[in-house]
Amino acid sequence: MRAVQHQPISLLDSWPAPDTDAVHHALREELRRFDRKVVVLDDDPTGVQTVHDVSVYTDWTEETFRAGLESNDRLFFVLTNSRSFSAGETTRVHREIAEHLAAASQKTGVPFVLISRSDSTLRGHFPLETETLRTELEALLPERYDGEILLPFFLEGGRYTIDNVHYVREGDTLVPAGETEFARDTTFAYRASDLTEWCQEKTGGAYPAEQVVSISLDELRRRDYDAVCEKLMGVSGFNKVVVNAVCYDDVAVFVTSYLRAAARGKVFMFRGSAAVVKVLGAVSDQPLLRREDLMCADQRNGGIIIVGSHVRKTTMQLEALQKGCPEIEYICFDVNTVFDDAALAAERRRILDLSLIHI
C-alpha cells in the first residue's frame, strides 16, 4: 500500500488559482444542453446541506419517482438512509429503487443521471449500492453504464483529494483519510487513503488500483476539458474514475468535461459527496441561515438540537456547544436501553418528562 504523509494546509495553495468566470461560463453552456434529470439517492440526511430549494422525498415508490422526473426542477433527492441498513437490507432497497426508477423513466420519457450521495470520509455501502443499481437498471433499461465516478471532495467539511489521496482537514493539517477515526468505523472500516487503492480494497480486487482512471488537479486547473473528456471516453466495464479536487471550481471543470462525454454517448453513475450534487444540479450559493430566516422577530419559543454520532469529532463539537452555550438544557439519552423493550419504554418516558419541563 502506498505510503502517505500528513500535509500542511498550505498544500491547497500549490496550484494556480482557477479562472472562476471562465470555468462557470463553460459549465453553464454545457448544462444548458444537458437534458437529464439529476436523481440523488442519499444514504444519510446530511446530503442536502449544500443545496436549497430542492425536493427531498422520503420514499422511493414509482409514483414518487414520476413526480420527481416530471417536476420542473433540475434535480431531486430521495433519502434512503441506507447507511444505517444491513448489507441485505440495502441490497433489497436498491433493487426496489432501480425497478421503480426505471419504470418511472420509461413512462415519463425523462432520462436521468444517478448520484449515489454518500459520506465524504468514505463510509457507506460501497461498492454494494452502485453495483446493485447498475445490475438492476441494465436489466430494465437499454443503457449500459461505462463507469462510476468517485468524487468525495467536500469543501465545507474539509475533505480534499490530492494526487489521488483523500484527506480530512484537522486544524492546519491534512490527514490521510485512512488514518482518521472514520476509517476505523465498525461497519465500514478501510485502510487505504489513495482512492485508487481504496477502490481495489473495497471491491476485493475487482478493480485494481493501476486500472482506476485518475483525473488530476493539473488537468483541472489547466481547464484541459479535452484531455479529461477523452479519459472519460475511454472508460468501460463500469471502471472507476477518481476525481481530484480542492475547490468547487475543480469540480465544475470536471463536470463540464463529464457533460461533454455524456453528450457523446458515455453513461456514468456518480458516487460522491454533496459537492458534486451542487455543481451538477446548478444550485446557487446561499449564505448560512440567520435567526430571522427561521422565525418571526417576536417568536419566543425555543428549539430542539438533536445530536447523535459515535465519532469523536461530534463529541468535541457537543462539548464546545455546552461550554459556549450553558443556557441550553442538555438531556442525554441512554442508548444502552435499546436492547431491552421495558428499559427503552422507561427511558422514553424519562426523556419525554424532562423535555416537557422545558417546553
Q: In which residue ranges do the predicted regions lie?
A:
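Conserved small/polar residues in nucleotide/adenosyl-binding loops
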Residues: 357-359
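Cap/lid and interdomain-hinge subdomains that line or gate substrate/regulatory clefts
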Residues: 28-42, 52, 68, 72-74, ...
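Short, glycine-/Ser/Thr-/acidic-enriched flexible segments
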Residues: 45-47, 81-84, 155, 247-248, ...
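N-terminal short beta-loop-beta anion/metal-coordinating cradle
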Residues: 48-79
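Conserved, well-structured core segments that form the ligand-binding/active-site neighborhood
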Residues: 165-352
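Short N-terminal secondary-structure initiator segments
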Residues: 2-27, 109-122, 305-323
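N-terminal signal-anchor module of multipass membrane proteins
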Residues: 5-19, 23-24, 30-52, 79-82
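Long, low-complexity, Lys/Arg-enriched
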Residues: 2-4, 54-55, 60-61, 84-86, ...
